[in-house]
Every structure is written in C-alpha cells, then in structure tokens.
C-alpha cells in the first residue's frame, strides 16, 4: 500500500483472488464451440500476455510473430482481453500482473521513487528462480539497479509455469549476466531412494536444451 501511494493517486484497488469470475461471462460470450474453452486456459493466456507486457492492441501481432497457438484464435482472444480489462476496471479491481506492471512503471518513470524503493532493500533472494517470467525479471532488475546483491535458487529441470510465461533461461543464463557469481550445486537428495534417483538421472541426461553436469546423489539407503 505504501508503494502504491507513491506511484498512483487514490487508494489501492482491491486485488482479484481469481480471474475466473470476470472471465466466466466473457468465455460464455465467445462464438461457436469456443465458448467451451476452459476458463483456466483463458486465464493462463492472459497471464502469459501480461508477463510480456502485451495489451489487447499488441497481443495478436505478438502471438503471430512468435508462432504461438492461443486457446482461441488471436483476434478473438484480443477482444476477450480488451473486455476483461474493461470489466476489471468497472469492478475497481486489479490482478497480480497489474501490480507488477505498476511497480515496474514506477521504476522506469520516477527516478525519485526508484531510489526510495531501492534504499529500503539491500539484498535480494529469489527462490524457484526457474519459474521467473519476463515481467518478474524486469522488475527484479529494476529494483536491483546497479547493485549485484542477489542470490537465486532454482532447478532448470523443475520449470512448471511456462504456460504463463516463465522460462528457465534466466536461471541457466545467470552466470553470464553475473560472471562474478558463486555457483553452489545442491545435488544431495534427502527424500528419494537411490533407485528413484538413478531413474531420474537417466531421464535428466536425455532432457534436450538443458545444460548438463547435474547428477542427483542419494543420501538414503536403498
């Protein structure tokens, strides 16, 4: 609330617990069989788009350029995106992505606010870094500024939220962006049996597009 008051006039709008109540009526208004598209798929696509700072006017061209297949045709989704934003504004609500976008805009447009925010936090630690999306990464970098006081923890083989825009590339490319960083490998496994880890290691060795060298080590007896 403090940060919002420094960036916007008026009180902080209420956050949406879920996009479903706003998306349900919009889903049912889609033509033909598209009205049966799962609301969750529509919500995931909204989060994917917002993670790339797309808006209804830029969405369709972006997905076509990327060769992405949305849950409904791009023109239909762009219209749904626009109606969702209007419904959200009428309800006086914001979603989680709106909060991140507003914070990032504050860093980008208000030097005084950026310096104030940066001064309140010196060290940053990010868990599950493999599930970071472009919007979150941009906000993290803006909050850091010129500092390098950052620790991240993640596993590129446990990336889950790619459907909403996350990518493990920020984790796997961390040492390139921060060449002075110290890498600590957490390979001792205290949960699984050696048999399970042997199978996991065989599968991981075949994972395409991932840096190798990881080998999980069992600490439990067979």
Language model: regions and residue ranges:
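Conserved helicase NTPase motor core
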Residues: 46, 68-173, 185-195
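Conserved P-loop NTPase-based nucleic-acid remodeling module centered on helicase motor cores
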Residues: 1-58, 172, 216
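A contiguous, low-structure linker/loop signature
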Residues: 48-75, 79, 217
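Proline-centered turn/helix-capping motifs that create local helix->coil transitions or kinks
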Residues: 50-59, 93, 148, 204-216
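Conserved catalytic core of Hanks-type protein kinase domains
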Residues: 6, 143, 177
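Hydrophobic/basic alpha-helical segments enriched in Actinobacteria
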Residues: 29, 34-39, 67, 74, ...
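Alpha-helix C-capping/helix-to-loop hinge sites
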Residues: 6-10, 26-33, 49, 66, ...
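Conserved coupling/interface region of RecA-like P-loop/ASCE motor cores
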Residues: 9-12, 158-220
């Amino acid at each position: 609330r403090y940060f919002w008051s420094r960036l916007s006039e008026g009180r902080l709008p209420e956050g949406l617990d879920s996009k479903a109540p706003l998306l349900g009526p919009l889903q049912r208004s889609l033509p033909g069989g598209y009205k049966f598209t799962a609301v969750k798929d529509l919500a995931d696509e909204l989060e994917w788009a917002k993670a790339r700072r797309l808006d209804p006017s830029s969405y369709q061209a972006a997905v076509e350029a990327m060769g992405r297949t949305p849950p409904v045709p791009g023109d239909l989704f762009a219209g749904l995106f626009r109606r969702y934003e209007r419904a959200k504004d009428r309800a006086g609500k914001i979603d989680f992505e709106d909060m991140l976008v507003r914070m990032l805009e504050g860093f980008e447009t208000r030097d005084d606010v950026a310096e104030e925010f940066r001064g309140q936090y010196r060290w940053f630690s990010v868990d599950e870094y493999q599930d970071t999306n472009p919007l979150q990464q941009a906000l993290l970098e803006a909050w850091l500024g010129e500092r390098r006081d950052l620790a991240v923890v993640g596993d590129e083989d446990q990336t889950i939220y790619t459907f909403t825009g996350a990518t493990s590339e920020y984790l796997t490319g961390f040492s390139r962006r921060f060449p002075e960083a110290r890498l600590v490998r957490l390979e001792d496994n205290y949960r699984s049996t050696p048999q399970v880890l042997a199978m996991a290691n065989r599968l991981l060795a075949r994972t395409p597009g991932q840096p190798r060298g990881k080998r999980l080590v069992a600490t439990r007896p067979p």
